[in-house]
Amino acid sequence: MCALSREADAVLLLFDEFWDEAGDPYGRVKSDTNFYITGRIGKHNVVLTIMSGMGTNSATYAAVNLRASYTGLQLILLVGICGGLPRIGDKDAYLGDVVVSKQVVGYDNMLDDGTGRPNADVRPLLAALDTEFMEKRLKMAAAIHLKELQQEAKEQMRRAEYHYPGAKNDAIYPPEYSHKHKDLCRACAENPDFFCRSAFQSSCAEIGCEPDKLIPREHREDLPKGADFAPEIFIGRLGSGNTVMKSGLDRDRIAAKYNVVAFEMEGAGIGEEFPCIVVKGICDYADSHKNKIWQNFAAATAASVAKAILAWFPSSSDGQYEPPPKGMTWYSLFSKY
């Protein structure tokens, strides 16, 4: 499900074939207003659906319609971008790394009641992916798919840039250090928890965020822009809500209380009755310093991990990769932040 085109564009670069180049051959039920793109990724027939908007309500509506039109649906992958914690468990997390949902909980009205458990059909796969052995395999496969995506984007002369933005653009401030004008702005000065629209639309350099306030971190490698980057993959509990997380203090408070590793906006809208795995690339640190520099690259790393996951999901295909008849088994790729 894509509320932003950038997530869908990244996913579509990893389609191996399209079944709908001459128009939609499968149709949809009368009440379904979703838009679909169908094709093949690896050994699976896939359908990508684009949401009408952001948030859990839009996700619920799109998922229900999808299930009605594609009754043979076996797996939903909710693929896109998210805000992540700078440290997950005992590891530093960096922009471009990918999180995979072990559980999804709504942080707008979060209750630790066990909700958000993955569907029973995907629990064995998630348990396998959580092993060190499969994690290494997944990471290696995702790195290959990322290079394929970048090459395909180049060949198609895509406007979007999917290469690594560079370690120097991966910076983080303390959670209490807000992204706001440091002087000459009454709105930013009057409320410590508020910053003006102009600040929100400006870069850290433009509004005077002080470089000496940055948290010093050792990157895995001091990679320049455009370098090869193999994303780390974290499997854990994701927070999901209808509002964008953009406070370092709120991020850390909620993460500590509910043991979440990242924040996104659609996963909680897809109920336990749907076989769903959320795969999101970290494009910011869920604080007030968020920007769009990493969004395309994070969408690309998430799409690459999603394709790697699909390779280990059982297929009902007989090995003949042709446009399937209506009623065939389908796998859905959703993407959004």
Task: Please describe what each predicted stretch is.
Residues 1-334:
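Intrinsic-disorder/coil detector with helix-boundary
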